[in-house]
Structures are given as C-alpha cells and as structure tokens.
Regions:
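Bacterial Sec-dependent N-terminal signal peptides
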Residues: 1-22
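N-terminal "domain-start" segment that seeds a small globular fold
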Residues: 19-35
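Thiol-based oxidoreductase modules, predominantly thioredoxin-like and allied folds used
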Residues: 23-26, 69-97
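Short active-site neighborhood of thiol/selenol oxidoreductases, capturing the structured segment around
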Residues: 40-53
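Structural recognition of the beta-strand scaffold that forms the well-ordered cores
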Residues: 44-47, 77-81, 113-116, 123-126
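C-type cytochrome heme c attachment motif
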Residues: 51-58, 112-115
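Typically the conserved alpha-helix immediately C-terminal to a functionally engaged Cys/Sec
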Residues: 56-73
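Non-catalytic, surface beta->alpha helical segment in thiol-disulfide oxidoreductase systems
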Residues: 102-162
C-alpha cells in the first residue's frame, strides 16, 4: 500500500513539475484571450515577441508604465506569443505562433509585431504604418502618432489618456 501511495505522489509531482514548463499553444492563448475580451467588453492586443528582443521589452515596459498601464488593462486583453527564438531557446516559442505570425504580417516585419483583434478574432489593426513598415515599439513622434491613432480607433481611450500614452512612448532622442 505504501508503495502505491509513494508511486502516486511521485507521479503527481513529476506531472506537476513537467506542467510548469508547458508553453501554451497559439490556439490556447488566443482562445483564452478572446473569451476574456468577450466577457470584459475589450479587444485583444497581441504582441509577437522573443526572449532576446530588446524592442519587445521596451514595448512591454512602456505599456506597463504606471502612468498608462491601467489604460491598456481597461481596454485590452494583452497577450504575447513567442516567435523567432534562437536554436537553444526554441522551446520558449508558442506552438503554432510562427505560422500565425506569418499569416498576419504583410511583407517583411520584425518584432515586436502587434495585432489588435476584437473578441471574435477579427483583425482590427496592426503595427504596420501606411507604408507597410512595422512601427513595432514606437519611439519617434511619427511612430507614436500612428500608434495612438490605432489605439484611439480600437479602444475607449480619451484624448487625455492618449496624451499620457504619447508622453510615455515618445523618446525625443529618436527625433
């Protein structure tokens, strides 16, 4: 009897520990996001990123800045899908994410590449400007203006909130 109990306990802990390393698939991430967005009356802000991507980290840092974090949280369900990982970090990629990225981007695009969906999975907009260039993590005045315009069209953000976002994202050193 003790042997059976020990075996069950070991199996439980091995399963639990293995489960901690499980990376959700693109479908799992997106289905959870769509359901949450539907329930909360929000849109989905998807960012494709990678562990090595400095611009991705900058985008995250800006979106989570205390001055504007609530603006994003109140209007979007924000999710990430990892792609373009190095050979030794391929295990960090979400299964299905690279193909999803390829289906959404137009032409060549680096990361971060972001797409805004409604709660039904319809694309509302993405990080490509009118010239099909990826603004990714916007820093210049023009990039931030495009970003803020997209946010205005896909959220309930008011002009004051959009102004705060502009101040957080615009890095005058790049203009």
């Amino acid at each position: 009897m003790n042997r059976i109990i020990k075996t069950i306990i070991i199996c439980f802990f091995v399963g639990f520990l293995n489960g901690q390393d499980t990376i959700l698939s693109k479908d799992e991430v997106m289905n959870i996001a769509y359901a949450e967005a539907e329930q909360e009356g929000k849109n989905v802000f998807l960012m494709f990123d990678a562990s090595w991507c400095g611009w991705c980290k900058r985008m995250d840092k800006n979106m989570n800045n205390n001055a504007c974090k609530n603006f994003f949280d109140d209007n979007y369900v924000t999710v990430h899908l990892a792609i373009k990982e190095s050979k030794e970090n391929k295990h960090l990629e979400n299964p299905g994410a690279p193909d999803f990225y390829d289906s959404l981007k137009e032409g060549t695009s680096g990361i971060p590449f972001w797409v805004i969906f409604d709660s039904k999975g319809n694309v509302l907009d993405n990080s490509l400007d009118s010239n099909n260039n990826n603004i990714g993590s916007p820093v210049t005045r023009d990039e931030v203006q495009v970003f803020v315009s997209i946010l205005k069209d896909t959220s309930k953000l008011n002009d004051k909130e959009l102004s705060v976002i502009t101040e957080v994202f615009w890095d005058k050193a790049y203009d």
